[in-house]
Every structure is written in structure tokens, then in C-alpha cells.
Amino acid sequence: MEEKQREKVVVIIGPTAVGKTKLSIELAKALNGEIVSGDSMQIYRTMDIGTAKVTADEMEGIPHYMIDIKDPEDSFSVAEFQELVRGHIREITKRGKLPIIVGGTGLYIQSVLYDYQFTDEAGDTAYRERMEKLAEEQGVEFVHKKLEEVDPESAKRIHANNVRRVIRALEIFQTTGKKMSEQLEKQKNELLYDVVLIGLTMDRTMLYDRINLRVDLMMEQGLEQEVKRLYQNGVRDCQSIQAIGYKELYRYFAGATSLEEAISQLKTNSRRYAKRQLTWFRNKMDVAWFDVTDGEKTAEILRYIEGKLQLKSNNN
């Protein structure tokens, strides 16, 4: 029997502020592509400035998916992300287009490309309800500490406010005796798609300068007002507000810090996150890195993708 041809996928990764959005639009135009956001925070409506969401003008008519699909109060799991993005890959491919995933959330992107299993076969409704009650009565930190005791790796990865996922990890351990973190690590080395992983990097000093500048620009664009609306609307203890740009300003609105200190912390956290992103991708995935310190490398990257996926661009 002839082996089913794997779907072609391009993935663009790299730290925040390195230029992924601009490159993705150029590649989509050249390769007849459509774009899927791989950022776990761009899914939230009304959280536009702080998540550096692509604007309608920037899209240049290229369809984008996985943006504005949840309210800030909603939780969102890696398993949901995996299912939705794989669906978009199928649909985009069926239309004869090339799926281009753009983003910086490493685990989420990895869960799509590799054979990560998030099965629902392990379930214990009574236990789940008991944990939900405990979270209500004793607080989310109490339940999170229980997870720390049995699966410290998952506890590190899952924020206490993401109660549903904390309880899911506890439930998996309760019913199977296996840690969720171990199950996530068990993946096939083989990619599910015919994929090209493009990574953008640049001189660290220049990158950090760009990140600082981006934060200043976000403040000019109204980030303070965007976060204030969420705060005044009573959005609390949610997964969404753990995003960089939101948690720092929440502390300001709660009276725990000055605006100046909050902005400084936001810059620091953004730089640290960029460093973690680079480290994660270098350690976990087979990425073709392109240094854009001296300017964009669109033509070079395009040639590389054409060669790897045996595609012809509209630029030829």
C-alpha cells in the first residue's frame, strides 16, 4: 500500500520582537500560504496590544487563524490547541494552500508537530469533582501544592490559576499512576508532517533594545488602558492574565507597585522570556536558524523552504 503523503507545514519560531510577523506575511504571499498563530495568548479577545497581535493592515489580506477565539476568562489547554491547529492544517492543505505556523510558545508548537497524546480515557469524575470543591474551599494554591507533591514537573509548567489543567494532571496521576509530565515527554521522534522549522535570531543586545522599544511602543498604543479594562471588568485569577504585559500592570492596578516599576518589570520579564524561548527551541527542536542582525533574510529563507519542501514560490 502506498504511504500517505504527509502534509507540508512551515513553522517560524524565535524570540519576541525578532520579526516573525513580517517574515510570515512575506512567505505566505510568496508560497500561497495561510497563517496559524502559534502563540498561546493571542487566542484571547480584547488582549491585542500586550500580545502583539497582528493588525488587519499587517495581514495584507492573508488569512490568519487561532486569533481571538476565547474570552479572557476562559482557560485553554495544550490539548485544545493541538486539536484546533491540526484541524487548520488539514483544512488549509485541502484548499491547496501552505500552512505557516508562527509563534513562540514552544510546548504548544511541539504538541502539534509530534505525536503527543492527550487521551481522555483516564477519567475519574468523582475525584475531579472533589478536587474542584477543594479548589473552591481551600484555594487554587492548595490544589496546586497537591500536584507539586506527585508531579513537580507538571506543577512547574502549569500555573496555579489554570485550575482545570492542574486538576487534569492530578486526575491522570490518580487514575493511571503516571505523571502527566512523563506522558508529554513520551513522543515519537518522527514528525507527523513534512515540516520546515525556521528560527530567527539576532545579536542579543540588539534584540533586547528592540524588546525595550516594543514595550515603550505598546504603552504609547494604550497597553495601560487595555489592561485597566480587564482589571475593571473583574477578570481575575485567569490563565490569560499570567501573560507578560498583563501580570505586571495588574500589580500596578492592585496598588502593589508604581507604573514606572511595572513597566521596568515588563521589560525585564520580556527579555528573560526571549532568552528562555531561544534556549527551549535550541534544546528541543531541529531548527534551521537565520541570523537577522544585519537585516531580513526573506529571500534566503524562501530558497531554503523551496528546497526542503520542493515548492515553487510566486517570486520565481
UniProtKB/Swiss-Prot annotation:
Interaction with substrate tRNA (site feature) positions: T105, R128
Family under the similarity heading: Belongs to the IPP transferase family.
Keywords: ATP-binding, Magnesium, Nucleotide-binding, Transferase, tRNA processing
Catalytic activity from the UniProt record: adenosine(37) in tRNA + dimethylallyl diphosphate = N(6)-dimethylallyladenosine(37) in tRNA + diphosphate
Residue numbers spanned by region Interaction with substrate tRNA: 39-42
Single GO BP term: tRNA modification
EC identifiers of the protein: 2.5.1.75
Gene: miaA
Lineage: Bacteria, Bacillati, Bacillota, Bacilli, Bacillales
Subunit structure, interactors included: Monomer.
Binding sites annotated in the UniProt record for substrate: T16, A17, V18, G19, K20, T21
Name of the protein: tRNA dimethylallyltransferase
Named cofactor requirement(s): Mg(2+)
Any one Pfam family match given in the protein's UniProt record, by short name: IPPT
Binding site residues for ATP: G14, P15, T16, A17, V18, G19, K20, T21
Keyword tRNA processing: yes
General function of this protein: Catalyzes the transfer of a dimethylallyl group onto the adenine at position 37 in tRNAs that read codons beginning with uridine, leading to the formation of N6-(dimethylallyl)adenosine (i(6)A).
Keyword ATP-binding appears in the UniProt entry: yes
GO molecular function, one term: tRNA dimethylallyltransferase activity
Entries under SUPFAM superfamilies matching the protein: P-loop containing nucleoside triphosphate hydrolases
Enzyme class, broadest EC rank: transferase
